[in-house]
Amino acid sequence: MCRPGSRSWLVAAVVGLLVLAAAGGVSAEPKLRVVVTAPFDASGLEREDQWMGEGVAQILSLGVAQHPSIVQIERGRLRSAAGTDTLTEPVLTQAARAVRADAAFFGRIERRGTDLAVVPQLMELKQSGPEVTSLEPIVAPSAELFGRLATLPVTYVRTLHVSTTDAEAARIEKAARPTRVPRAFELFSRGQISAFRGDQEGNEAAVDLLSRAVEVDPSFVVAAYMLGVVHSSLGNRWKAAAQFRAATQLDPQYPEPYKALGDLYLSQPRRLFDQAVEAYSKAIELRPFYADAYVGLGDAKAAKSDIDGAIAAYQKALVYNPVNPRVHMSLGKIYYGEKGLYYEAVNAYKKAIDLDPRSVDARMGLGEVYEEKGLYKEATEEYRRVIEIDSKHTGAMYNLALVYEKVDPKAAIAQWERYIELASPLATEKDWVDVARQHLRKLKNQVKD
């Protein structure tokens, strides 16, 4: 039997049930626009000023997050789809299509005499091909530039012909001006660049830069929140929680740190589910269209066995963000695990993979279905793909060894040895390593005989 996935089956089942319920005709009005935001090309600037390209992207992301009709694709998915950090227009077009965006925000920054010019562009991905619109450049002295960019997110939204009230525009502009201290914003942007690297060194550099941003501007709530996010990525739960709480005190109306606290509570060994529900609910109170907070709320209620409450939360999450591949992955789990519906499960997993080809959870689920149905060739392909994406994915290495036992004992021996070498130093893999060694001894004896 293959190893069970690391995600809670109950949560996955609830999400699947939600999608079944939602399939009856939930429609999102007004129409949602799915967008990606790329760092602006600042390669023509001096090296010490090239952080500004990320700075513009941050302003856009912070601003449009305030609009209920804009769904933003995470930067990590965009980078994975692109396969590079250099997002030229052709690369951006291909990557945006891959993540199912229908628009992309991008552009460049150039020097014009003593001023800087931000030259924004909008790409709409239509069936006939990409259509690029050039927006009015914003030209200003360096010290004044980022203060003038607060109107840019609204310009993008209205160029997309998305209805925007005066109150929404004011909320967007306020969010797009997260600090009035230029040096603090520079440190914040540099910190984001480091954090996007996703490795230990990058996160540690981000902690230093974001800490300095908060020192320069103690009221910079977004920097305080992001410092907590990076601490969480480094496994520093207590420091992360302290930063999130500090952010809620700096600005009690800012929902992101409440959602982040919910994530921390939900993942605590002490099972702080009630506190998670409270934190997610507060985030939703502050931003009623906060899709990720609804997902967290659904997870927390499912963990409390409040199935009806979980379904209602997931329903809201789908209304505000219907392009989440996790939905289809969860459908695959419930189709096969609960109902034994093989074809429906395979189709659901394939849909999740179509939306996010690098989803190791969906590929693991599909591989497990194939394996249990005796389709060892197909299972092998999925587990190998997971290992290509994440060479240290112990679950895929373990399951691949099990499949090889059915078809090629010698290959299984080699795979078990690779798994044991990788997993032995990991405390979380101890029991699995013990089982693997038993399999390995048995196989070696069989091959001898």
Question: Where are the predicted features?
Answer:
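Short beta-strand->alpha-helix linker/helix-N-cap micro-motif
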Residues: 30-94, 104-116, 124-138, 173-177
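Terminal, low-structured helical/coil segments at or just beyond the last alpha-helical repeat
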Residues: 406, 410-449
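C-terminal/domain-edge helix-coil "capping" segments
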Residues: 28-33, 95, 126-212, 216-219
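Helix-start (N-cap) detector for alpha-helical repeat units in TPR-like alpha-solenoids
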Residues: 184, 221-222, 255-256, 291-292, ...
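Position-specific recognition of the canonical hydrophobic site in helix A of tetratricopeptide repeat
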Residues: 195, 232, 259, 266-268, ...
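Structural signature of tandem alpha-helical TPR/SEL1-like repeats
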Residues: 201-208, 233-246, 267-282, 303-316, ...
